[in-house]
């Protein structure tokens, strides 16, 4: 399970390890325009915890306990590795924290690759570091969370803020193309829009798991996308995986499960691959393939899919349509004036043409 809190770690792993061809979808100006990572900082606090026997140990020892869970990545002391691959590192006595600064160039990437070998291995290290932030949760709170059966369990889980995190990324600067003339700027990742964050998150996950025997489950990936990205999402996803698997084509066929309400995404899927979920009169959820209902989704218009799958036949907003319909029913107004008012007030649509026709045919 990978959530939005790990977006920086996922993206960083991809930008450090993937070849330029695999990163084309991110670099494309029409997508995010991310050309690479410029620099970033990592901070690790030297906290002390108590184990179940009451003995004290630092999180250095915690890594030793979990060493086997990350396939031997931690073959060397982590802090020695980070010192070796960073541009500069130091220890802050006041807050008991280590800082590692990285000015990223090709040598930086080669250094990461020599220690961590693959993007997924590098990410596993970052993921484990993120886990340490949870150790601030008391045993009493852990027990309450584990035994909770309510719908507000997530709200019980308080994560420390940036100042108290054991592991934290700082000054995460990306190189972004700002216009079609090639202008570039260094931007913090937090300066990107919600849609860009979601796009980066989805594509980076797919790149990260491209060589893994995995089922990718994407829950409404288009939520914050603009219309252009929604209409091109499947094409972009397909192109991203194809480029990433170049020279290793047997990995290209990935099983991806997408939940969506977007007619654009459905229009790019064959009917035998589209499963429609509906509730019957008793409230039971029924599942049928679009092909079983003779709904040809592939290449279908969004209005057709809206009507056939989502039961929404409206092609324009409900408020505008009701106002348009109300105007067409006015009988005490000059016909030509009414035609002019409808033409001026409303944008172009099939509904508008039908209303104009209805008014024009009035006796």
Where does each model-flagged region fall?
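Extended helical coiled-coil dimerization/tether regions that scaffold
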Residues: 7-200, 204-215, 245-248, 360-361
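Switch/communication elements of ASCE P-loop NTPase nucleotide-binding domains
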Residues: 161-315
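C-terminal alpha-helical "lid" subdomain
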Residues: 308, 312-363
């Amino acid at each position: 399970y990978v959530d939005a809190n790990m977006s920086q770690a996922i993206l960083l792993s991809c930008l450090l390890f993937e070849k330029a061809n695999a990163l084309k979808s991110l670099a494309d100006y029409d997508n995010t325009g991310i050309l690479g990572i410029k620099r970033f900082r990592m901070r690790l606090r030297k906290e002390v915890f108590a184990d179940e026997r009451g003995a004290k140990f630092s999180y250095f020892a915690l890594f030793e306990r979990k060493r086997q869970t990350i396939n031997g990545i931690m073959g060397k002391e982590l802090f020695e590795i980070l010192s070796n691959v960073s541009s500069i590192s130091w220890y802050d006595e006041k807050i008991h924290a280590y800082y590692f600064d990285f000015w990223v160039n090709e040598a930086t990437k080669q250094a990461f690759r020599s220690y961590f070998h693959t993007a997924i291995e590098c990410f596993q290290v970052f993921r484990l570091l993120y886990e340490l932030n949870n150790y601030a949760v008391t045993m009493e709170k852990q027990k309450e969370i584990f035994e909770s059966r309510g719908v507000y369990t997530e709200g019980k889980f308080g994560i420390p803020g940036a100042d108290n995190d054991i592991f934290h990324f700082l000054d995460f600067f990306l190189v972004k193309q700002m216009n079609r003339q090639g202008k570039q700027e260094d931007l913090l990742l937090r300066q990107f829009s919600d849609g860009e964050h979601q796009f980066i998150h989805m594509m980076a996950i797919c790149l990260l798991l491209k060589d893994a025997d995995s089922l990718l489950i994407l829950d409404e990936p288009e939520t914050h996308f603009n219309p252009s990205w929604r209409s091109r999402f499947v094409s972009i996803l397909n192109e991203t995986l194809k480029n990433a698997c170049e020279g290793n084509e047997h990995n290209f066929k990935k099983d991806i499960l997408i939940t969506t309400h977007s007619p654009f995404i459905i229009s790019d899927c064959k009917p035998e691959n589209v499963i429609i979920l509906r509730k019957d009169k008793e409230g039971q959820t029924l599942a049928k393939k679009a092909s079983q209902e003779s709904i040809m989704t592939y290449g279908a218009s969004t209005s057709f899919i809206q009507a056939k799958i989502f039961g929404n036949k409206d092609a324009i907003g409900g408020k505008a349509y009701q106002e348009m319909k109300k105007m067409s029913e006015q009988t005490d107004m000059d016909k030509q004036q009414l035609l002019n008012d409808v033409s001026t007030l409303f944008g172009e649509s099939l509904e508008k043409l039908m209303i104009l026709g209805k008014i024009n045919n009035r006796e």
